[in-house]
Amino acid sequence: MPQLNTAVWPTTITPMLLTLFLITQLKMLNSNYHLPPSPKPMKMKNYNKPWEPKWTKICSLHSLPPQS
C-alpha cells in the first residue's frame, strides 16, 4: 500500500487559508452595516399631581431644624 505524501500539505493549506481570509475580508468590506439608532428626543408631559405640593410641604417641614 503506498504511503500518503504529506510534505506538500503545508504549501497547499497556507495559500488556501490566506485566500479564504482575503475573500472574507473583501466580502465584509462590501457589506453595509446599519448605523446605531439615534436617540429620540423625549417630550416630558406635566401631569397634575395633587399630592405633590402636600408631599413636598411635609418633607420640607421635617427637614427643617426645630424652631424655638
From Swiss-Prot:
Residues found modified as N6-succinyllysine: K54
Transmembrane annotation, as ranges: 8-24
Any one Gene Ontology cellular component term annotated for this protein: mitochondrial membrane
Topology with respect to the bilayer: Single-pass membrane protein
Domain of life, per lineage: Eukaryota
A Pfam family recorded for this sequence: ATP-synt_8
Keywords for the protein's UniProt record, in alphabetical order: Acetylation, ATP synthesis, CF(0), Hydrogen ion transport, Ion transport, Membrane, Mitochondrion, Transmembrane, Transmembrane helix, Transport
Subcellular location: Mitochondrion membrane
Protein's GO biological process: proton motive force-driven mitochondrial ATP synthesis
Residues with PTM N6-acetyllysine: K54, K57
Single GO term (MF): proton-transporting ATP synthase activity, rotational mechanism
Function: Subunit 8, of the mitochondrial membrane ATP synthase complex (F(1)F(0) ATP synthase or Complex V) that produces ATP from ADP in the presence of a proton gradient across the membrane which is generated by electron transport complexes of the respiratory chain. ATP synthase complex consist of a soluble F(1) head domain - the catalytic core - and a membrane F(1) domain - the membrane proton channel. These two domains are linked by a central stalk rotating inside the F(1) region and a stationary peripheral stalk.
Family affiliation: Belongs to the ATPase protein 8 family.
Subunit composition and interactions: Component of the ATP synthase complex composed at least of ATP5F1A/subunit alpha, ATP5F1B/subunit beta, ATP5MC1/subunit c (homooctomer), MT-ATP6/subunit a, MT-ATP8/subunit 8, ATP5ME/subunit e, ATP5MF/subunit f, ATP5MG/subunit g, ATP5MK/subunit k, ATP5MJ/subunit j, ATP5F1C/subunit gamma, ATP5F1D/subunit delta, ATP5F1E/subunit epsilon, ATP5PF/subunit F6, ATP5PB/subunit b, ATP5PD/subunit d, ATP5PO/subunit OSCP.
PANTHER family attached to this UniProt entry: ATP SYNTHASE PROTEIN 8 (PTHR13722:SF0)
Protein name from the UniProt record: ATP synthase F(0) complex subunit 8
Organism from which the protein derives: Pan paniscus (Pygmy chimpanzee)
